[in-house]
Each structure stands twice: as C-alpha cells, then as structure tokens.
C-alpha cells in the first residue's frame, strides 16, 4: 500500500513471518537509485500492542490504508491488516490451520513504531483476500480449503460491528470486493460471482454462475474492478477475462480467452484493459484487451493484443498513461527468479521492453 505525505512516498508492506519473529509490517520510505529505507517495522511475535502476533509464514492479504481524507497528515491514519495467525509445525516446514486469522488496526503510523490493536479475532479460515472498502465498511473473505465454505465479512469502520455472508460451499482466495454504492461484488472459487446489498449485507444478495456461460470458467481469484461506466471486470483461473454488469440483475456482458490461466486484477485506462496471465512458473505474460461501449450502453471487444510474454505474471499491472497514447506498464513475475519489469505499449501489435 502506497502513501504520499508532503511529497514523500511511503510503502506499507505485510510480509511472511517464517521463523520466530512471525509476520511483520514494514513502513518503507521510497526513493530513487537504491535510496529507499525502512522507517519502522512492527515488533516480533510476542510483544502485545506493537506486534501482529501472527505466527504463520503465509500471508496473502493486502492491507487497507484509511487516511481519513487528509493525505498530507498521517497522524490520524489507520492501516487495517489481515493475517493468518496460527500454524502447526511439521518436519521441513509448516502446515496451515483453518483457525486463528484476525484483522488488526495499526495507528500512530507517523511515530517511531505503530500501535497494534485487534479489530476482529478468531476468524475461521485463511484471510487470503485484500481488505477493501466503500468508505463506510471494510470487506474481506476467508478460504478454508477445498470445497469448504468460506465467509465474506462486512465490518463497519465507525464501530467495528460485523455482518457476514457464508455460501453453501467454496471460499474466497485473492478475491477482493468492489462497491457501486448500493451493492458490493466479489468472486469465489468454483466460478461464482456474488453480489450483496450494502445495507443488508447478511440477508440480501445473489449469485451469478459463470460456468453457465463457460463450463471451464475456473476459480475467481482476482479482485473485481469497476470502471466509470459501472462495468465489472475480473479474471478466472480458467484463463478468462470477464466483463459483467448489474442492471436488471447481475449478467455477463462478455468474456474472452486469455493466453493462459489468470489471477491478475484487470487494470483499465481509457479503452485499454491490461491483464497478466501465467502457465506454471516459467511461462505467461501480459495482454491488452481494447473495449468499446455501444450506442445501447453495452460493452464489446474489438481487439486483443500481446504486450509481453515469456514469464508468469500473476500480479496486477500498474499503468502510467491514459490509454490513448503510449502507456508504461509495471509488473512483477512469480518465477524461481522473479523480477520487476517495465514495458511500453502504444496500441500496436505488441509492447516493447523498457527495462
């Protein structure tokens, strides 16, 4: 999570806690040419009030930073962090348990060390989704493994009151939520896209079964992205990019096959949607899907182009540009020798490597 305060950019990073220290959050001052430095880290496991006290070395949830609407004043900011806090040792590693996950609030982010307080503890399953917000509530989901049912949570920021939704089966993995102001949308394993009422999260909602459109849709393991026209975009492990809308109900506008499976949250600038894909740990790349809106308000696909290839990309794509000229794309790879890349793309037949 990035934050810029009075011209200085900071990154808050949750990282795996293998060993005695447990999971940690670090605040990093970002600078060019190798000049970045760590401002603080939370304390190792066992220090109440300044430690996450999360023993698992497996952490996948992206934190959420609430800057209270004052981006140049970090004194009242809160960083919400979800962790898997328990595991059982076995010879040669660790085996994750389905209990012990929790959400914490880190305050005093401008101090030498933050204060850590519990928001919600005793959560069943792994918190493997990012924590997202609609400005009033936090949203996140859990994954208990296999076809076991996970739970999606709605936590009110003002008092930490909780409402939950638990489907009949399957959980939520990397599947962050997005809101249109009335409903919230999130995907799950087994090719399902859910909507829930913000006002009545625990009682009112529905589901769209993507396998009715593509039997090989696969798990939804990306966050749902919504554009200014209200269309919802996400990817599935069956190797598809999807566009859905909520008009008279949740429906599929279109879906398109990608180069391979995908867990990448789409990034849309102008009419271009950038998305990563991968096949194992040594193949994949980035593609650009160009979309248009018809006179009837529907969305359709005029073209798909390769931007980069030769490496597995599971991350989202950070884009500098507006989708009309040359865009610069930044991403990393999930490989034995992973790396960060920058590519440029101007709407042509392919992209160009910058570094």
Stretches found by the model and what they are:
Residues 1-355:
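Extracytoplasmic/lumenal domain signature
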């Amino acid at each position: 999570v990035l934050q810029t305060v009075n011209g200085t950019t900071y990154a808050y990073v949750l990282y795996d806690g293998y060993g005695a220290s447990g999971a940690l959050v670090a605040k990093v001052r970002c600078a060019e040419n190798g000049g970045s430095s760590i401002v603080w880290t939370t304390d190792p496991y066992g220090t109440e009030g300044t430690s996450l006290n999360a023993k698992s070395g497996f952490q996948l949830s992206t934190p959420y930073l609430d800057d209270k609407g004052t981006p140049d004043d970090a004194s009242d900011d809160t960083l919400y962090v979800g962790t898997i806090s328990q595991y059982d040792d076995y010879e040669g590693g660790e085996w994750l348990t389905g209990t012990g996950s929790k959400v914490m609030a880190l305050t005093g982010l401008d101090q030498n060390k933050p204060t850590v307080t519990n928001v919600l503890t005793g959560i069943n399953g792994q918190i493997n989704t990012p924590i997202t917000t609609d400005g009033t509530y936090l949203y996140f989901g859990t994954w208990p493994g296999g076809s076991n049912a996970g739970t999606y949570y709605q936590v009110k920021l003002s008092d930490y009151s909780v409402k939950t939704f638990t489907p009949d089966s399957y959980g939520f993995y990397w599947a962050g939520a997005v809101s249109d102001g009335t409903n919230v949308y999130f995907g799950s394993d087994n090719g399902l896209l859910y909507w829930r009422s913000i006002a009545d999260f625990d009682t009112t909602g529905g589901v769209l079964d993507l396998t009715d459109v593509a039997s090989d849709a696969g798990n939804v393991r990306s966050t749902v992205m919504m554009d200014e026209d209200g269309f919802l975009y996400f990817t599935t492990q069956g190797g598809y990019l999807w566009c859905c809308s909520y008009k008279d109900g949740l429906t599929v506008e279109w879906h398109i096959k990608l180069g391979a499976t995908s867990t990448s949250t789409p990034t849309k600038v102008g009419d271009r949607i950038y998305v990563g894909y991968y096949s194992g740990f040594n193949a994949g790349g980035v593609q650009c899907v160009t979309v248009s809106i018809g006179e009837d308000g529907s969305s359709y696909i005029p073209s798909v182009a390769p931007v980069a290839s030769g490496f597995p990309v599971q991350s989202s794509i950070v884009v500098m540009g507006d989708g009309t000229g040359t865009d610069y794309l930044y991403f990393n790879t999930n490989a034995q020798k992973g790396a960060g890349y920058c590519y440029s793309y101007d709407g042509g037949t392919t992209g160009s490597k910058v570094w």
